[in-house]
Amino acid sequence: MDVFRRLIPYLAYLFSSFLKLTTRVKIVRGEIRDRLRAADQRFIYALWHQRQVFFTVSHRGDNVTVLVSRSADGEMMAEVIRLCCGVVSVRGSSSRGASGAVLSLMKALKSGVDLGITPDGPKGPRCEVKEGVMYLAQRLGVPILPVTNAQSNRIVLARSWDQFHLPMPFGRAAVVYGEPIEVGPGDDLNLKAAELKRALAAITSEAEALVA
C-alpha cells in the first residue's frame, strides 16, 4: 500500500497531462486574473475542495502554491501539486494562530507566486467558507480571486464529504473567474466569508451551465 501511495502522484501527473490534452476548455473572465498580474498584484485563488483536480490541470505552469494539511492525504496532494504545477506546497492550517503557515505563505507571496486555498477544506462542511481564508487575505494584504470549474465528462464521488469531482478525458470544461474580493483591516470576516460563498455559488452555477 505504501508503494502504491508513492506512485499515486506520478499516476495523477500522467492522468492530468492526458486530461489537459483531450479537454476543450472555455475560460470566462480570464482578463480579471490578467489584470491583477499586469499590476503585479499577488492574490489568493479560492475554489471549492471538490473541484481542485481540474484547478491543477487548468493552472499548470502558473506561479501558484497551495496550502495543504499536514495529514498523510495532504502530503500526497502536495506531491501531486509539485508535479502538476511545478511548485512546493505550504503545509499547515489557515486558521487563526497558525503563524508558521502564515509566515510561509508570506514568503511565497514575496517570491512572486500566488496562493490557492479551498475555503471549505480539508474536511468540510462542503461549500461552506471558513473564516481562515478571509483571515489570511486580511493578514497578508492581498485580494481573493474566486475561481471554479466544471466538466461535461466527470465522475462525482457521492460518498465523499465534498462530493469530489474527478474529471474524465474527451469532454468540455469551463473555468470561470469572479471579481476579486478585498478584505480590509477593519472588515467583518464573517460578512466577507458570506460574500465569497455567494461569489463561488454564482460562478459555479455559471460554469455548470456552460458544460450542460
Feature map (PLM): residue ranges:
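Catalytic core of membrane glycerolipid acyltransferases/transacylases, capturing the structured
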Residues: R42-R96, L157
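A short, well-structured juxtamembrane/interface segment
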Residues: S17-R42, W48-F54
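A conditional alpha-helix N-cap/helix-loop micro-motif detector
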Residues: K26, S95-S99, R126
